Amino acid sequence: MAISIEGRIARSPNVCGGRVCIAGHRVRVLDVVVWHEHQGMSPDEIVTQVPSLTLADVHAALAYYFDHMEEIREEMQAERAQAEEFRRTHPLTA
């Protein structure tokens, strides 16, 4: 398992599908990025929504993102493609 940002960010093949996450939690860096960058949540609001996280955890996740933007954006794109494929192969029926 690889750990960085003062032990707050980890990657393990058995946790979150091997995606980078906040150590000790099943919250991916990608989740924090979506909440912050796409839903407009402040770090304080994220901690309020996920009280098991600390403000330092959220800031570490954002710091990791800003240092590894391409990696996280590729994960985001892969998830979008996977969701689109699922919608295509499992259409809604009335």
Say what each PLM segment does.
Residues 1-19:
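Basic, low-complexity segments
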Residues 24:
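Anion-recognition interface
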